[in-house]
Amino acid sequence: MFYLIASAEGFSRLFNLIRYITFRTGAAAITALLIGLIFGPRFIGWMRIHQHKGQPIRDDGPKTHLAKAGTPTMGGLMILIAVSISLFLWMDFANPYVWACIAVMLGFGVIGFIDDYDKVTQNSTRGVSGKVRLLWEFGIAFFACYLILKDGNTQLYLPFYNGPVIDLGWFYYPFAAFVIVGTANSVNLTDGLDGLATMPVIIASLAFFVISYVVGNAVFAHYLGIPHVPGAGELTILTGAIIGAGFAFLWFNAPPAAIFMGDTGSLALGGCLGTIAVATHHEIVLGIVGGLFVAEALSVIIQVGFYKRFKRRVFRMAPLHHHFEQLGWSEPTVVIRFWIISFALALLGLATLKLR
């Protein structure tokens, strides 16, 4: 909204700052942060009243988690509302990349909300069928890929390598959709401890703030030897809003959590990160920056596959964070150490921009 005002004749001098992406990114972060902090307590109180029993706790999980019974879920709604309002105020509505990310964020958020609602109302940990959920997720992801790939760039870029490796052509669509859906569900699997998924999402968003900015800037992109995507710089406003809303949510999600993110938030934020990676053509770098999410997802895949084949478990419990809990690590220890790993991986991912 403010961007449109700044573009209007007669307001150019008064609102000149709004033309700058960096200013709008900071403003979006502060706006989302304030919305979350101010309205968070009321939102949590409302959720406590209407959810009664709160988030169902798995019987086969760590026994220490049973003490969390009654904690409300669907906290991702708070994040989505804060991000959406912030984007409405600060984004450029004419940018197709932002709309692709919003479509995934809200679409996956709806899927997660339905899943959370089903769990809460049925007092069950099962939720929506996995096949049904994946079907809708891939449908939304392919739509986002259609919006993003109108420029026709279907080339694949690798870290530490200067220039494109291969033109995937039509195969880029399923590849990109897999990145989006895979990231969403990986973040969803990571969201198992208080604050565990929130900070890595914030860290990954910070990394892709940098990536989006340099990819959208022709001078920086040419200097670094990375793909230049005109208009991708606008995605920094989205990353700023996610960072601000994420910190606001973490204020209430820090141990002991007053509210859980739920599938509403984890699917939406993970899908949005995947879409940003596709839009900036840094899909493989996302695998480095979001290496924690990849490790969590792989631990589940390995555990299930190995057990089906050999009737033995590789990990004491999956996802990976539960394995370390079973080794005797306290929940805060697991969370903080995973945060440190996430930060280190983000630095490594950013290093690939220069080391080519």
Swiss-Prot record:
GO terms for biological process: cell division; cell wall organization; peptidoglycan biosynthetic process; regulation of cell shape. Pathway: Cell wall biogenesis; peptidoglycan biosynthesis. One of its GO terms (cellular component) is plasma membrane. It is a multi-pass membrane protein. Its cofactor is Mg(2+). Its EC number is 2.7.8.13. The chain crosses the membrane at residues 27-47, 74-94, 97-117, 128-148, 164-184, 201-221, 241-261, 284-304, 333-353. It is an enzyme of class 2 (transferase). It catalyses: UDP-N-acetyl-alpha-D-muramoyl-L-alanyl-gamma-D-glutamyl-meso-2,6-diaminopimeloyl-D-alanyl-D-alanine + di-trans,octa-cis-undecaprenyl phosphate = di-trans,octa-cis-undecaprenyl diphospho-N-acetyl-alpha-D-muramoyl-L-alanyl-D-glutamyl-meso-2,6-diaminopimeloyl-D-alanyl-D-alanine + UMP. Its main location: membrane. GO terms for molecular function: metal ion binding; phospho-N-acetylmuramoyl-pentapeptide-transferase activity; UDP-N-acetylmuramoyl-L-alanyl-D-glutamyl-meso-2,6-diaminopimelyl-D-alanyl-D-alanine:undecaprenyl-phosphate transferase activity. The keyword Transcription regulation does not apply. It is found in: Cell inner membrane. Keywords: Cell cycle, Cell division, Cell inner membrane, Cell membrane, Cell shape, Cell wall biogenesis/degradation, Magnesium, Membrane, Metal-binding, Peptidoglycan synthesis, Transferase, Transmembrane, Transmembrane helix. Belongs to the glycosyltransferase 4 family. MraY subfamily. Catalyzes the initial step of the lipid cycle reactions in the biosynthesis of the cell wall peptidoglycan: transfers peptidoglycan precursor phospho-MurNAc-pentapeptide from UDP-MurNAc-pentapeptide onto the lipid carrier undecaprenyl phosphate, yielding undecaprenyl-pyrophosphoryl-MurNAc-pentapeptide, known as lipid I. This is Phospho-N-acetylmuramoyl-pentapeptide-transferase. The gene is mraY.
